[in-house]
Amino acid sequence: MNQTIIVMSDTKDLDDEHQIVNELFENGLEIFHIRKPKYSTQEMRRYIEKINKKYHNRIVIHSHHELCVSIKLKGIHLTERHRRKNFFRPWFLMQWIKFKRPDAIITASYHSPNSLLKHNPGYNYIFLSPIFDSISKIGYKNTFNDDSLEVALKKTNFNVIALGGVDYSKLEMVKKFGFKGCALVGSIWHTQNPVSEFIKIFDKWNLLENSVSV
């Protein structure tokens, strides 16, 4: 997996959100996760349809997964709640998605370094959170030990994306730990100019990536 920056939607609807998402794509965003837990299927469909169709293949959805097939999105995300609710349902869902859309990706969320040592059932990448104190969730604080986190990241079979409190100032630490990428939420949506902030983070990430590869 190439090192990448992912943006995840806020759970609440925000002013000019679709315009911002389109501008993020125009400025280099490769993957956008839509996390709107209160949306109905139709609300999710309408949200996606407001995003330029040429970017639909960069969208991953956290609910109403059937839309991944009908709209031909990039993939689906399974939350911890999905996996705990019914052990077999996520497995069947993964098989169905892979049958209908062999090119679709499947991702998941974990919240403990020990989870990284489990068998990978076929996720393209997973989020581990919160790596730092969350910006978007008040009181959602990092409880990880840095040493155990680095060890787990070296041993894991997962492609692990850092989520939670990641902003411009944390990018060097994300690289140091050994993550395959980072996901941005509050650092984008809780700023006055989300697009400018994304560009600043995106440019610094690429600069760090190029300095490592030289």
Describe these PLM feature segments.
Residues 180:
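Short, glycine/charged-rich "phosphate-handling" switch motifs in NTP-dependent
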Residues 145-150:
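Glycine-rich S-adenosyl-L-methionine
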Residues 124-132:
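Non-cysteine beta-strand/loop elements that form the S-adenosyl-L-methionine
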Residues 132-138:
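A short acidic, helix-capping loop that chelates divalent metal ions and anchors anionic groups
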Residues 1-87, 91, 98-125, 151-158, ...:
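Conserved N-terminal beta1-alpha1 strand-loop-helix module at the mouth
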